[in-house]
Amino acid sequence: MTHYDVVVLGAGPGGYVAAIRAAQLGLSTAIVEPKYWGGVCLNVGCIPSKALLRNAELVHIFTKDAKAFGISGEVTFDYGIAYDRSRKVAEGRVAGVHFLMKKNKITEIHGYGTFADANTLLVDLNDGGTESVTFDNAIIATGSSTRLVPGTSLSANVVTYEEQILSRELPKSIIIAGAGAIGMEFGYVLKNYGVDVTIVEFLPRALPNEDADVSKEIEKQFKKLGVTILTATKVESIADGGSQVTVTVTKDGVAQELKAEKVLQAIGFAPNVEGYGLDKAGVALTDRKAIGVDDYMRTNVGHIYAIGDVNGLLQLAHVAEAQGVVAAETIAGAETLTLGDHRMLPRATFCQPNVASFGLTEQQARNEGYDVVVAKFPFTANAKAHGVGDPSGFVKLVADAKHGELLGGHLVGHDVAELLPELTLAQRWDLTASELARNVHTHPTMSEALQECFHGLVGHMINF
């Protein structure tokens, strides 16, 4: 039996980052993972999907915008090659995780870990046998799993993101349950490769957690792409008939049958809390079946922490990473900075145009009683967007009229996810719109749209 200062359960973005930070701070550290080193993100999520999205964007340019760019002639698009590239990208990043573990002298334990008690982890090793490890501190980073539409199950043709992203073959048609980030990203990729795509969303609009103006714009762009989006529509049943899947939906009390070769379930994620012996460690769950934590990621058991999707605060890879740093620094007794209101952290959907946001929507800000000022600048008035060939979308900023501080930012446009850090930095350190407007932005860049909105918040946009 080996003892460590810190044992991390799960090697996803949160887990491996927490392990690295703990080791950097001089703590003996082990990390336990049965399958996906780097987590869903590196293996079958964020990273390979971005490779596929880039391929899909190029297909879009060659099929929809070829004439505008002076491109002519016959071009073929091989999804199999795009798939192979996505796997190569993923495998390279996973190799990087193992390199970082070795570099930081972190012990890798390949197996499935469960708590035997509050200071012991029992690991069923992948190569057979078991190993017990004891620890002073543990960090739980077990991630999440796809929620299924109630009353349905998976089958050969009813799949999650994992099966779909690992498929080298494309269906002729697909129904996607859920118009969140995963549903919209897969919809973009598959439609550009010629798949007939229908997205079904239970709530009144696509990307329902985004600002209403954002949803309206992205629905318009997807309609131009040829994707059918059915909002305020409930999936009642899914029947896999082998060669065809039948999905029964209802809207306004009227039932309809949809048919496709495949169905992708993408309605959300549930924290992975079952099968890890949390009860034996005394770790408590919230009413939402996530692990409850404080601002330092501590559970109700003082030396056990929980980070990432499993705590349910904001299920995004970069949030897990940031939480992992906070947990490791807290364990080491080092100075740290808590993340504060998780609504103020950045989030993005990587179809083209991108959707990127942080903070409160305009409606949320009004509902919370703020005296709201809003500025909105379209990319049709941005020179770089025209040069890129995609002036769709806008920047919309929401601020507190009394103090001039940002409450939220909502962007749609080409690669606008890259613009978020300036906004979240400004919000984090309470910079005002007046102060931000004086920050000189490089010309020509998409970021000039931010500067225009900063000016707009204080009453004087320049180029619109």
Curated annotation (Swiss-Prot):
Primary location class: cytoplasm
GO aspect biological process, one term: cell redox homeostasis
Class in the EC hierarchy, top level: oxidoreductase
Keyword Transmembrane helix (UniProt): no
Signal peptide residues on this chain, from the entry's feature table: none
Top-level taxon: Bacteria
pH dependence: Optimum pH is 8.0 for PDH complex activity. Half-maximal activity is observed at pH 7.0 and pH 9.0. Activity is abolished at pH < 5.
Active site: H443
Reaction catalysis annotation: N(6)-[(R)-dihydrolipoyl]-L-lysyl-[protein] + NAD(+) = N(6)-[(R)-lipoyl]-L-lysyl-[protein] + NADH + H(+)
PROSITE patterns for the chain: PYRIDINE_REDOX_1
Effect of a null allele: Cells lacking this gene grow, albeit poorly, in standard medium with dextrose, glycerol, and fatty acids as carbon sources, but fail to grow on carbohydrates. They are less resistant than wild-type to exposition to mildly acidified nitrite, but are more resistant to oxidative stress in the form of H(2)O(2) in vitro. Lpd-deficient strains are severely attenuated in wild-type and immunodeficient mice. In contrast to wild-type or DlaT lacking strains, strains lacking Lpd are unable to grow on leucine or isoleucine.
Database matches in InterPro entries: Class-I_Pyr_Nuc-Dis_Oxidored, FAD/NAD-bd_sf, FAD/NAD-binding_dom, FAD/NAD-linked_Rdtase_dimer_sf, Lipoamide_DH, Pyr_nuc-diS_OxRdtase, Pyr_nucl-diS_OxRdtase_dimer, Pyr_OxRdtase_I_AS
Sequence positions that bind FAD: E33, P34, K35, Y36, W37, G38, G39, V40, C41, K50, G113, D309, A317
Cysteines engaged in disulfide bonds, as pairs: C41-C46
Family: Belongs to the class-I pyridine nucleotide-disulfide oxidoreductase family.
Function, as annotated: Lipoamide dehydrogenase is an essential component of the alpha-ketoacid dehydrogenase complexes, namely the pyruvate dehydrogenase (PDH) complex, the branched-chain alpha-ketoacid dehydrogenase (BCKADH) complex, and likely also the 2-oxoglutarate dehydrogenase (ODH) complex. Catalyzes the reoxidation of dihydrolipoyl groups which are covalently attached to the lipoate acyltransferase components (E2) of the complexes. Is also able to catalyze the transhydrogenation of NADH and thio-NAD(+) in the absence of D,L-lipoamide, and the NADH-dependent reduction of quinones in vitro. Together with AhpC, AhpD and DlaT, Lpd constitutes an NADH-dependent peroxidase active against hydrogen and alkyl peroxides as well as serving as a peroxynitrite reductase, thus protecting the bacterium against reactive nitrogen intermediates and oxidative stress generated by the host immune system.
NCBIfam families: lipoamide_DH (TIGR01350)
This protein's name: Dihydrolipoyl dehydrogenase
Species per Swiss-Prot/TrEMBL record: Mycobacterium tuberculosis (strain ATCC 25618 / H37Rv)
